[in-house]
Amino acid sequence: MTVSAIKIIEPGEIQGLPDKDMPQLVVPSPKHLFAERASRLEYLAKDGELKGWLEFCAMLAKAQSEVIDKVSVASVDDSLITGSLKNHIPPLSISTWKVNEEWSTVYQKFTEQLAANKLPQKATESIAAFSKLSPDDQAKQVIAFLNADEASVRPEYAPFIGAALQLIWTKRAEQLAAYTEFYKGESSLCPVCGSHPIASVVRTGDRDANRFMACSLCASEWYGPRARCTNCETPIEVSILGESQEDSVQGECCDECHGYLKLMLQSKDPMMEVMADDLATIGLDIALSNEGFQRTGRNMYFLSGGEQETKTS
């Protein structure tokens, strides 16, 4: 891949404040989310060197879509939601969550659905190996991955842990649909759960030309000013790196912290799905790494492979 750097204009010039009627926080509809993700992954897997990898990821998303209606989570108190959002505290913070029966039930339902869909042998062996761990060791793996302590996580367990955690958090985040208007502000971490973004996306429709951060865990999206580093929040403009200006997925790269987050332009590919298109553009990650930049976004289907300076909620 040929990577070229294109400097963008100052943050204040590229975009001012969002329109007052534009939603600044959007929470997911899990059933549609996972079905669309599976469909997009199946489409992206048709050709190219990543065919096998994307087919496996499509199986994960398909199982998520098939099991999501069987997932039940505890309800969240109304006053906790409104109070937290008003005070810029994630109401579903990962920092206070513990591995519990809810997790065990969701993980079991998810992996049983995967087994019914005829997983590759290596994936089946990884699930079996995880099941042989003691409950304490399982919990350590889950909590480490949830909190982005990726060095402590076995890579073969990551896709299954991550997918099950997404089932829980998207279902929990769905409960906030009636309260999103209480969120006003800016955040580099998800205002719903406190997780890292997977990428930023410039949407069309009622959020036309505005940049939103997409959560890697709960799939909520929140407004973020363009041309600003989402990792260190320096006022210095970021660079856009990619094969060409016409690419629908590029890298927002910061010369201060040397981190990058993918930028996805829905206007260039209306069918894009943030997590799926992140998985399909691993070549861009490799190219940006070769340019000296470190990935700051997360994808719950794999480990990023580098030490990430992790913000906490």
Where do the language-model regions lie?
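Short N-terminal helix-initiation segments at or just after the protein's N-terminus
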Residues: S131-D136, P155-A163, C193-V201, N290-T310
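Residue-identity detector for threonine
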Residues: T2, T82, T96, T105, ...
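Cys/His-clustered metal-coordination modules, chiefly Zn-binding fingers
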Residues: A173-G292
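Long, contiguous alpha-helical scaffold regions
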Residues: M1-L80, L263-S313
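Extended aliphatic helical segments
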Residues: V3, V26-V27, V67, V71-V76, ...
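N-terminal alpha-helical interaction blocks
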Residues: P18-A177
